[in-house]
Amino acid sequence: MRVGIGSDVHPIEPGRPCWMAGLLFEGEDGCSGHSDGDVAAHALCDALLSAAGLGDVGAVFGTGRPEWADVSGAAMLTEVRRLLGEAGFEVVNAAVQVIGNRPKIGPRRAEAQRVLGDLLDAPVSVSGTTTDGLGLTGRGEGIAAVATALLRPRV
């Protein structure tokens, strides 16, 4: 078994679509970034790559890779799952926590867990929290996410 941890943070960009945990949150401002700004999906990618010893999200999808510009977090997770398979791993489970005032994760938690779980073919737990007004997430300047992933060798 292999364990990985990942994180991501992006500034909020008014008027940009808000993609989070593979879902579009209508009426919410999204995050700026090289791709869709889905910090939950990006943190999961980071955790999965870390667990497999395959680097990090910046190395695989960073700004030096123009073919990944404006791509969805779902597409990134699909690519990471492919890379894991090539490296001989499969996902056992994963968890991601979104840190920010908005969007509210709770009302769409089950949907997010289903979408991410389907992408990884494994259970994914999704949660949300705030920082009680502290830091860039508390001031509404950005959104962060942390994730863990458990992998096993494919048999």
Curated annotation (Swiss-Prot):
Function: Involved in the biosynthesis of isopentenyl diphosphate (IPP) and dimethylallyl diphosphate (DMAPP), two major building blocks of isoprenoid compounds. Catalyzes the conversion of 4-diphosphocytidyl-2-C-methyl-D-erythritol 2-phosphate (CDP-ME2P) to 2-C-methyl-D-erythritol 2,4-cyclodiphosphate (ME-CPP) with a corresponding release of cytidine 5-monophosphate (CMP).
Binding annotation for 4-CDP-2-C-methyl-D-erythritol 2-phosphate: 8-10, 34-35, 56-58, 129-132, 139
Catalytic activity: 4-CDP-2-C-methyl-D-erythritol 2-phosphate = 2-C-methyl-D-erythritol 2,4-cyclic diphosphate + CMP
Pathway(s) annotated for this protein in UniProt: Isoprenoid biosynthesis; isopentenyl diphosphate biosynthesis via DXP pathway; isopentenyl diphosphate from 1-deoxy-D-xylulose 5-phosphate: step 4/6
Pfam families xrefs: YgbB (PF02542)
Entry keyword set: Isoprene biosynthesis, Lyase, Metal-binding
Official protein name in the record: 2-C-methyl-D-erythritol 2,4-cyclodiphosphate synthase
InterPro entries per record: MECDP_synthase, MECDP_synthase_CS, MECDP_synthase_sf
GO biological process, one term: isopentenyl diphosphate biosynthetic process, methylerythritol 4-phosphate pathway
EC number: 4.6.1.12
Organism: Nocardia farcinica (strain IFM 10152)
